[in-house]
Amino acid sequence: MNYLDMLTRLGVGSAHPGGFSATMSQLSRFPLPAGSRVLEVGCGTGRTSCYLAKQGFDITGLDLRPEMLAKAKLRAQAEQLDVRFVEGDITALPFEAAAFDIVLAESVTNFADIGRALAEYGRILRPGGTLYDREVIATPSITVEAYREVTGFFQLNALLTEQKWIELLQASGFAEITVCDRSAFVQHVTDDQIAYPDMNQVMDPGTVLNASVWQTSLAHDDLIAANHDYLEHALFIARK
C-alpha cells in the first residue's frame, strides 16, 4: 500500500506538515480578503475547504481521488455546508483563466509535475491573485541516498530545495514571492489531534484491522525520522 492510498483509507483531514494547526496559524497570520473566490487544490477530505466555507468564503475544493471527494462531501453534509467539490488534476485544472482570487495548496503540488501545476495555478488566478502553497522541501545538503528514499516512498517526481521552488514560481509568472514558516519536518500528529481533533474523519470499513495501513504508517514515520536532517517544510506565498 502506498502513502496516498493509506491517507485515503484513513480519511486523514490534515496530513500536510504542521497539520490543521499550521492551517489555522496561516489563516490567522495571512487572513484571506473577504469575498475572495478560493480554490483549494488537493482538498482531500475537505477539512480546510469546509472551514473556509464556514467563514463565508466562496470555496471550491478539487481533488484527483473520487474516494477523497466522497468523504469531503460527507464532511460538508455533516457540517451542513454547501461546498463545491470537483474531481480534477492540478496539472490540467478544469477552470477558465482568472477564475479565482486565491489558490490554497497543502502538501499537494509535490505529488505532481510541479512546474506544470504552478503554471496552472498562475493561469486560473486573476491578476493580483495569490497562491499559498505549503510543501516539504529538501535541504541543500540532502544526499543522493536520502533523495531516492524519500521520493521513492512518496512517489514524487522531484523533491526541490527552496531556491528551486522560487525559480519555478518565477517561471510560472509569479512576481512577488515570500517564503514563510520554514522549519524542520517533524511528526506533529499527536499534538495536532489534541489541539484540533477531527470530529468528521471517515475511515474506510476494516481500516483499523488492515495491517498494510499500519505498516505504511510506520514506514512513513521511520522514513521521516531517518531523514530529518534533509527535510524541511515551508509556506510559499506568491502573488501573480
Annotate the PLM regions:
Residues 102-115:
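A short SAM/SAH-binding and catalytic strip from SAM-dependent methyltransferases
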Residues 157-173:
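Short alpha-helix
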Residues 178-240:
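Conserved Class I S-adenosyl-L-methionine
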Residues 16-34:
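Conserved alpha-helix/loop element of class I SAM-dependent methyltransferases that forms part
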